[in-house]
């Protein structure tokens, strides 16, 4: 028995779903099928399959208390192609959205009217789907009903999917058929570990996206066991996990994979890197925690605890360099991923404009940010580290090379107080901003998305909400220690 086995076994006792939970999901699925079949017959709708996908479906890699159901309905691609046979693949994709929208409204939502599936509503990812709530034994089960085009595996491998969810049933079959029961338990342990690190899914506290379920499943598939993965996790960026056995150079020649920090190729689609969206920050923090676990294995590394709050006072070494933006979302209908992406765009703009003047000279120096949000309270926070929050009123702006006579004369006319330095002309220029906090305030008020209200922009010591204090903890204790920048 390995030195980790006892820990793994102890954790598994707490996270493997109970038979009662599994049976409850099975009952919900059967009830859903019956409602959908009745309406399908009425409308003359033909489908190829109806079954649950994801971890609670055919994969069976879910954690205890994971009651969400991803229910997939396959549509016959031959009928679909006959209807839209003259369209290109991109046009076919667009038309499929309209067709799926029609089926969501006329088939799925109407099927669930006056049933135990409450509040069936339209949601949108790449194309429309329906979400409903089913209460079972006091637990709210979110049921997502998703349609896809039932494509042959060879079609996907040769031409790719028409919509991204067309791969999903094949993902389920691959995991079902290629992981043993013990390996599926290793997947559960890995998911639990990522969640304990707050680095799982699209609500990851670090980066825009953490590790996802399918990436965890494939990591166990490629490494064979959780122990093997943990012992080599530090080398993951250098290990190109490719079902198709291509070399590093071959993979890096694929344009959309050139900059991806991690490579985990989808066995179903050779052109898809499952790890493309996983934040390097999430990897680095998980790598640190795995290293700690290897040195001193404890059950506590798998226990999910709330993020800590960081109360910063003037004695803290980063007191003057850490800042917080506290926001509240006023429109609960806007999905958190949309809000996340909007605020990432705002923060990237702050970073870009804050690090350099318009003329590219250094401004406030290195800027690092992290977004932390709590969907349940609609609170969103951007925490910033700024290398030089107070800077001089003027700076030397670089002009043309001295040898460029035509541009030199024009520069001299506009800037009679020029100086010569390092083979260029320079001129002392007044800055628009000398205080990072003022710069932050103006830019946020100019660019903040309309659905947000501003609660607070301040130095870190003046944060107000508990979620803001958590954002500061994430930035200072989970992000900055693992980045190469002046704070270290």
Residue ranges of predicted features:
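Hydrophobic, small-residue-rich alpha-helical packing segments that form membrane-like cores
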Residues: 61-63, 71-76, 131-137, 144-181
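Conserved nucleotidyltransferase catalytic core and NTase-mimicking acidic/glycine-rich helix/loop elements
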Residues: 182-348, 352-369
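Extended, charged low-complexity segments
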Residues: 370-488
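Short, hydrophobic beta-strand segments
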Residues: 69-79, 327-334, 381-386
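Conserved catalytic core of two-metal-ion nucleotidyltransferases
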Residues: 36, 42, 86-158, 357-382
